[in-house]
């Protein structure tokens, strides 16, 4: 893996490869609670 700074590594940093940082996923335990939290988060982020 060429990081562009002259250092080669066999593994990626904890953030992963920047080209793939476009999608995020979340897993919840309960259906209704997860829907409520998703709605709350979408309203509060605006």
UniProtKB/Swiss-Prot annotation:
Keyword Transferase listed: yes
Cystine crosslinks: none
Enzyme class: transferase
Cofactor requirement: pyridoxal 5'-phosphate
Organism name: Pseudotsuga menziesii (Douglas-fir)
Reaction(s) catalysed by this chain's protein: L-aspartate + 2-oxoglutarate = oxaloacetate + L-glutamate
Biological role stated in the UniProt entry: Important for the metabolism of amino acids and Krebs-cycle related organic acids. In plants, it is involved in nitrogen metabolism and in aspects of carbon and energy metabolism.
Anything else known: In eukaryotes there are cytoplasmic, mitochondrial and chloroplastic isozymes.
Protein name from the UniProt record: Aspartate aminotransferase 1
Alphabetical keyword list: Aminotransferase, Pyridoxal phosphate, Transferase
Lineage: superkingdom: Eukaryota
Subunit structure: Homodimer.
GO MF term list: L-aspartate:2-oxoglutarate aminotransferase activity
